[in-house]
C-alpha cells in the first residue's frame, strides 16, 4: 500500500514539472492604486537598503514621510561629565546568582538614558513640490483635484497625477537599484510658468519613541 502511494505521489509531481506561472501577471495583480494620501502608510520606492516614502504628489510635498537608509544612524553628544564606561549594567538575581543585564540603572539615569537612545536612525531629508496657485498663494493639499497614484510593483516605479487650477501634473518616482538615490520627472505646463519647483528639508533627529515621522 505504501509503495503504491509513493508511486502515485511521484507520478503527480512529475506531471507538474512542466507547469509555469506568469510571474509578472502575479505581481501586477497586486498593483497599488489610490486617489489619496495615507498619512501612516505611504507609497514607497527603494532597493532593500534605502527607502523613500511619498504622498499622492509623488514626493513628500504635504506629508513629511521618511527617507531612510541602512547607514542613516545618528548619536547625540554625551551629557557633560558622563562617559560610556560609567555604565556597568544592572545586577539581577538569576537562580541565586547576580548577573549583569543591560537595563536602565536608576542610580545612573543620564548614561542609562543616553545608551537607550543612541545610536538611532534618522531621516535623511524631505523632498517636495513647491507649488503656487494662479493668484500666487501657496498650494495646499485640498487645492489639488483628480489625484491618482499607482505603484508599478514589477518596475518599482510610482506614477502620480493630479490637476492644479485645471492644469495636469504628472510625476514619476523611481529609485536607483544600486545606490541610495531617487529619480523624479515632473511634466506639466506649470513648470514653464514657474509655478512648480522643488524644496528640500533636512530635519534634525529626535529621541521621541514610536513616532510616525523621524525629525
Language-model-detected regions and their locations in the chain:
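Glycine/threonine-rich ATP-lid/beta-loop region of ATP-binding domains
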Residues: 14-16
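Beta-sandwich/jelly-roll carbohydrate-recognition scaffolds of carbohydrate-active enzymes
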Residues: 18-215
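Sec-dependent signal peptide recognition
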Residues: 1-3
